[in-house]
Regions:
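Short, conserved alpha-helix that lines the donor NDP-sugar binding/gating region
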Residues: 86, 90, 113-122
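Long helical/loop segments within the catalytic core of UDP-sugar-dependent glycosyltransferases
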Residues: 93-112, 116, 146-214
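Acidic donor-binding loop at a coil-to-helix junction in glycosyltransferase catalytic cores
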Residues: 218-225
Length: 225
């Protein structure tokens, strides 16, 4: 059962500087207040990084600073040998929400993206997993609360909208919006088949029951289908 949450809470940065997130919209605050009034599930946010030191330096602190009325952890899975990424993670390692692990260099003949997601999910302490790309940043400190308030007992998947930054070209922003609107419509009709993976929640038990990417780990692409 799928709950689609169509709200531009996530903004993907395309060659742009950080925006000022000091102010939030009334609708966002209202949703956050509703979330604080209910029992929120524990959430594990999984971020898979590949040469994303700059993006993590810019966006990871915003993820760690989420105002969430429940327990949450942030799991970053990076590649061993990426010294810049490791340095960023070490600088933020004092944060109680952060946990990171490294993929061994020997795992070359398989999809490293799928392997990273699998490792992150297995390391998660929570039933609910949030998949996030390192190039994405929350548009407010209530992003996680607004997403997680949809994690009800009768749902296994929560799909959120993510958009390009305002500095991206118009046709790029339109194309992304069009594709996601189509994907969300299919999900609402119980025919979810793909997502960008940048703002997606799934139950760990479901992922493990389906054995994750076991049958397609040797295929480089397809992690979002």
């Amino acid at each position: 059962i799928i709950a689609s949450f169509v709200n531009p809470l996530f903004r993907k940065i395309i060659l742009s500087e950080e925006a000022d997130l000091s102010s939030t919209e009334d609708a966002d605050n209202s949703s956050a207040n509703d979330a604080y009034g209910q029992q929120m599930p524990s959430v594990s946010i999984v971020i898979t990084a590949h040469d994303n030191a700059a993006e993590l330096r810019r966006n990871l602190p915003l993820v760690l600073a989420q105002q969430y009325p429940g327990n949450f952890q942030v799991i970053v899975v990076a590649e061993k040998g990426d010294s810049e990424t490791e340095n960023v993670l070490k600088l933020l390692s004092a944060d109680k929400h952060l946990y990171y692990t490294l993929i061994p260099e020997s795992s070359r003949y398989m999809s490293r993206k799928k392997l990273s997601i699998t490792i992150g999910v297995k390391a998660a302490k929570s039933e609910w997993i949030m998949l996030v790309e390192p190039s994405c940043r929350p548009e407010s400190e209530h992003w996680l609360a607004n997403m997680a308030r949809n994690c009800n007992k009768d749902k296994d998947l929560v799909i959120g909208y993510s958009r390009y930054d305002d500095d991206a070209k118009m046709y790029q922003r339109f194309e992304r919006m069009l594709i996601q609107c189509y994907s969300l419509r299919e999900a609402q009709q119980s025919m979810a088949y793909r997502h960008y993976g940048s703002n997606l929640m799934i139950r760990k038990s479901l992922f493990m029951k389906q054995e994750g990417f076991r049958s397609s780990l040797n295929l480089v692409r397809g992690e979002y289908d």
